[in-house]
Amino acid sequence: KGIQAVDDARLAADAGVEAVALSNHGGRQLDGAPAPLGLVAPVADAVGDRVEIICDGGVRRGSDIVKAVALGARAAMAGRAYLYGLGAAGERGVDHVLGLLDTDVRRTMALVGARTVADLSPALVSGPDP
């Protein structure tokens, strides 16, 4: 479904792709697959200067989006979150969920002291080096 290892991200970058999606199957098919959010930093370190990184999976709230971007992702996909809104209230539910995500992204950025997306960095979400 998507990249699940740094070596695969390197292969994709070497092949000339413009972006990689870090993804798994949500624990449904293989419960031992790495979480996409946990792959963002190592993949960004390895190939972030050559490809855009998209974090696909595990996004439940705006703070997850902030973490993904701070760690090196260009974008984060939140498929399940909007489906809950769709199932509960149709189009209005999707709008509501997107509003909640937007509010949480803005709140989280304020709490970590990031005024813009460009201000996000790994140090804001991963703590100091030991």
Regions found by a protein language model. Give the residues of each.
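Alpha/beta enzyme core
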Residues: 1-55, 62-84
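Electropositive, surface-exposed helix/loop patches at the edges of structured domains
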Residues: 52-66, 112-125
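C-terminal extensions of enzymes
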Residues: 82-83, 89-130
